[in-house]
């Protein structure tokens, strides 16, 4: 017999049989070796073939193992291995059967058929396990589908649909698919296209996360429930697994062979199968090599003839990029656009899915949580689509509650740690012999006893609460399972089973659920199993950094005292602080316009009066860190071409992939303070970009992504009108301020365009600083020096006359507070540094600073 006339699978089985014989010290290869190798072959057709013909495969494998154990073993042989007479005879019989059926290559199924009525131990074992020649022959005919074996790889291509597709209708029948709520219009349109005579192939196009795959799952569920037109009843929806199709296709033509086998199996089923290709664009170019045909081109003839009933799904961008370029492929599909559902539709979808997620996590999901998931995700998570982002929110919030139930409560954990500390102390005190130690040990023992009792009581409470929650989870799972069984019985029209479930099993389970809920209605002390709107808000805050969760009392008080907090760092400038504080309070109370930034201001004033310092203080107040402020020095954007640095370079330019300086910063931290410093120095084109941000709270970057600025506070600083401010500042009265602001606005209107000024929430003019304010600033700035000295173990004691002197030296009405910093450096820091280095002060000393003859004098305190 020529080995090259065997199929590759049969050749592999013979090689495995040889290895099996060598491993067991057999010097003759028998038929049992070959069948054992065929049964153990991964992806082979022998095991499913025998199962279909009614053979008990595990029992057969066991009998083969016993037969192998009885074969004689040979030790010390020199590798002489031969084919036994029984195997030789069976192989000849296999060859004969293959020729009778017109096969060019000998397939492994003929070996199984030849063994069915053979007198060898293999035949006996096969018949004992339920093997019947006629049944095996019928199973072979069904497996081959009337085709002959004409290629070496013919066995690889069998059962292509089972290997390379996932049966969605079977999954829907077994209740493994999530329910699909709404989307009736899209499903109806898909069915309409599928009912056409030719080009009956819909392609679902929509943004990622809008539910394209869910529509096909909904169609599969409708087919199972018989809620489709006559033309689609009884059809199967199979999802093509592109990963399985491509994986392991090592040689050229292997991928095409697999795809051809799938198409061949589909055409045999004569329109009874609808093929779903998720990520349809992957078919274009798949398997493409020099001169080879890609998968998209192989599909075209089958699509055009109507042999292939297909549903595709892809995103808008990928459809444009891949499918539209291939006009011949595009015209064979009918577009069905899937839009993003509204917030109301999303709430309905979440209500339908709620039970599945509640059972999976073993928690209760409240209706306010569902409404919050839809509304908050729509408002704050702008770079993703509904309903996907809302489902993710609900899922993560439920996961968080489940994790808290499973892990030890904080109170118990704290008690346990305290107990460990006390027990360590007890062991140390046991080694001491003095009376005081014995007394402390006795006190410690009583503390440990008290804590252990408290810990034990709490632990019991936690365990009982946890057990109560787990009980309801189990009942929920049983109810879910009973409902699935009821649906299956309804489809089979098994009225006895339906009656048993509907009037027996379900009411009993619901009664148990009611009793369990009554136990749960007592407020649990340590665990919580309800997902509420607060949990959803907490997850949104963690995702985006935007504080949308319910404000704690402490935070409310902090916001009401915001002006006082800012005045600790910024001296004077009442109007500016009031305007900024009001904007933040509006935003946190949820009253600000949801389609504009939380606040947009232009700060005007001479240099050194606190414009930038107020922004730093605000960032520190909001985020507890000045690092959270996005600071952009607008003097860097004086040229026209530098505008692209803010939003990213356009396509074709260097740096296109990197994104913009402003847009990337806001995408990473959507809740932030943006400081555009020295804004008048920027090129006029920068303001064209800012118009969109100030009006709509959004900006499109160089890559076409929309960046959300609605949760930012935008502050621009400028020195415009400084001369007028110095001249007209007057006595600080309201009239003088109004007159000064009018003069400054004249300068501002001459520099900025009306459409830019009109979009700002407020223009704030800062006052020049007077001597009293400079003195207060000196006190604030010296606090930084005190901190640095404290790190070295030194204290600073500076009296009022010394502070007055510093204020006088550092006062300059033109330059504001900046000369004060230089005055502190020259008058205090420089002489103090010399004295510390010379060893005059050591750790623990106090540095006294006093005035002597118009100068500052330093003494050790």
From Swiss-Prot:
Q: Where is this region: NBD2?
A: 555-768
An example molecular function term from Gene Ontology annotations: ATP hydrolysis activity
> InterPro entries in the record, alphabetically?
AAA+_ATPase, ATPase_AAA_core, Chaperonin_ClpB, Clp_ATPase_C, Clp_N_dom_sf, Clp_R_dom, ClpA/B, ClpA/B_CS1
Please tell me whether the keyword Amino-acid biosynthesis is annotated for this protein: no
Question: Is Transmembrane given among the entry's keywords?
Answer: no
Annotated positions binding ATP 1 = 206-213
In this protein, which residues make up the domain named Clp R? 3-146
Please give the residue ranges the record annotates as the region Repeat 1. Answer: 6-71
Per the record, what is one GO cellular component?
Answer: cytoplasm
**Region (Repeat 2), start-end ranges:** 83-146
Chain positions covered by the region annotation C-terminal: 769-861
UniProt xrefs under Pfam families: AAA, AAA_2, AAA_lid_9, Clp_N, ClpB_D2-small
- Coiled-coil features, chain-numbered ranges: 391-523
**Could you tell me the Gene Ontology terms of the biological process aspect for this record?**
cellular response to heat; protein refolding
Instruction: Tell me the keywords, alphabetical order.
Output: ATP-binding, Chaperone, Coiled coil, Cytoplasm, Nucleotide-binding, Repeat, Stress response
Which residue positions does the secretion signal occupy? none
Give the residues the record marks as binding ATP 2. Answer: 605-612
Out of the domains of life, which is the source? Bacteria
Region (Linker) location: 341-545
Location(s), subcellular? Cytoplasm
Name the principal localization, coarsely classed.
cytoplasm
Stored PROSITE patterns:
CLP_R (PS51903), CLPAB_1 (PS00870), CLPAB_2 (PS00871)
Instruction: Name the family.
Output: Belongs to the ClpA/ClpB family.
Function noted in UniProt? Part of a stress-induced multi-chaperone system, it is involved in the recovery of the cell from heat-induced damage, in cooperation with DnaK, DnaJ and GrpE. Acts before DnaK, in the processing of protein aggregates. Protein binding stimulates the ATPase activity; ATP hydrolysis unfolds the denatured protein aggregates, which probably helps expose new hydrophobic binding sites on the surface of ClpB-bound aggregates, contributing to the solubilization and refolding of denatured protein aggregates by DnaK.
How is the quaternary structure described?
Homohexamer. The oligomerization is ATP-dependent.
Q: Which protein are we looking at?
A: Chaperone protein ClpB
Which species expresses this protein natively? Answer: Xanthomonas campestris pv. campestris (strain ATCC 33913 / DSM 3586 / NCPPB 528 / LMG 568 / P 25)
Upper taxonomic classification of the species? Bacteria, Pseudomonadati, Pseudomonadota, Gammaproteobacteria, Lysobacterales
Coding gene?
Answer: clpB
